Amino acid sequence: MRILISNDDGIYADGIGQLRKAMETIASEVYVVAPDRERSACGHGITVTRPLRAKVHPFKSGHAKGWVIDGTPADCVKLGLESLLENPPDLVVSGINLGPNLGTDVLYSGTVSAAYEAIINHVPAIAVSLAAWEELNYQVAADFMKDFIPMLKEHPMGEGMLLNINIPNNYNGRGIKVTRLGRRRYIKCFDKRVDPRGKTYFWMAGEPQNLDDDDPETDAAAVNDGYVSVTPLHLDLTDYSYKKKLAGWLPTK
């Protein structure tokens, strides 16, 4: 099996290090193409106004080959698939992200966007996140992925689909729930401050608010109950029900 790994926390992050070691135990070829620094919440941005630079990044142990890129997570996967790897991978895995990627967070997430870039290029992908901010246990997420990925050999993913996986920090084998994306927004988003010259500036902060707390089918509900959430996502954002209504009254030809 050939696996390409990326992330948005950067190549030096603990999460991607634990994921690399886990993937080396189940794949004969492992490649890591990751940003040179943290690029959290950069979405699906790509670099078009300057050249990208790729440097070989050797690891102290294991058989993985690595490159560090001065670009976004989507840049990393795009460059890896189109220019760095001699042969396409069987799977792209993005993570292990520091913190959850639940609900509409996937629209901001560089981790999930790296996985989306893979399926744009016809490679199945998984985005995996550790749903915690402190006392991080990346090993529990890495162990889960080591057991989960081999199951895909018997049950291949569909064309143009990725799996968004969120793993509780205290996961104890309670189980997996197949979920949908919940609705999530942030309140008290900006911390307003004044600099020594009297000019106003803002730090983005914010507290997450789940808008579907009464729905047990959401990813956030599953994680809050101690389950691993697995949410299938695809590229097609079309609202087909409204498409029919729109075609019914617009003067289309």
From Swiss-Prot:
Q: Give compartment(s).
A: Cytoplasm
Going by the UniProt record, its keywords in alphabetical order are: Cytoplasm, Hydrolase, Metal-binding, Nucleotide-binding
Gene3D superfamilies on file = Survival protein SurE-like phosphatase/nucleotidase
Under the cellular component aspect of Gene Ontology, which terms does the record hold? cytoplasm
State the superkingdom. Answer: Bacteria
For activity, the cofactor(s) needed are: a divalent metal cation
Gene Ontology molecular function terms on file: 3'-nucleotidase activity; 5'-nucleotidase activity; exopolyphosphatase activity; metal ion binding; nucleotide binding
Q: Give its E.C. classification number.
A: 3.1.3.5
Record keyword Nuclease present: no
- Please verify whether the record's keywords include Lipid metabolism: no
**Which sites bind a divalent metal cation?**
8-9, 40, 97
**One Pfam family of this chain:** SurE
Which reaction(s) does the protein catalyse, per the Swiss-Prot or TrEMBL entry? a ribonucleoside 5'-phosphate + H2O = a ribonucleoside + phosphate
Cofactor details (free text): Binds 1 divalent metal cation per subunit.
Which function does this protein serve? Nucleotidase that shows phosphatase activity on nucleoside 5'-monophosphates.
Protein family per UniProt = Belongs to the SurE nucleotidase family.
- Protein name (Swiss-Prot/TrEMBL): 5'-nucleotidase SurE
Origin species: Desulforamulus reducens (strain ATCC BAA-1160 / DSM 100696 / MI-1)
**Gene name of the encoded protein:** surE
